[in-house]
Amino acid sequence: MPNIEIAQADEVIITTLEELGPVEPTTEQIMRFDAAMSEDTQGLGHSLLKEVSDIQKTFKTAKSDLHTKLAVSVDNPNDLMLMQWSLIRITIQEELIAKTAGRMSQNVETLSKGG
């Protein structure tokens, strides 16, 4: 039977936090932390409201474009299809916004009841 030799490990195994000693953050970590702390501190609610506001602006723009197209008499089938597509897109966006708002209100109610 051959001899199997196990080499002794030369590295030190750290078993407690005290043995680790103080850890200094790198310059990159400090810069990332400072950047994160200096960002807008309005919170998640403010971010959500801003996103909904941005969606509302694009929604209003799409609606006004559609109204402009509908005001002009169009005989070209391609233009009619583009108008129909715009109307479908607006309808889908409207439904998604309504569903999102409903889900958000349900989540807020759940948080306020369970908190």
Swiss-Prot record:
Induction: At 37 degrees Celsius in the absence of calcium. This is Yop proteins translocation protein I. It comes from Yersinia enterocolitica. It comes from the Bacteria. One of its GO terms (biological process) is protein secretion by the type III secretion system. Belongs to an operon involved in the translocation of Yop proteins across the bacterial membranes or in the specific control of this function. The keyword rRNA-binding does not apply. The gene is yscI. Signal peptide: none annotated. Belongs to the YscI/HrpB family. The lineage of its organism: Bacteria, Pseudomonadati, Pseudomonadota, Gammaproteobacteria, Enterobacterales. Keywords: Plasmid, Virulence. The keyword ATP-binding does not apply.
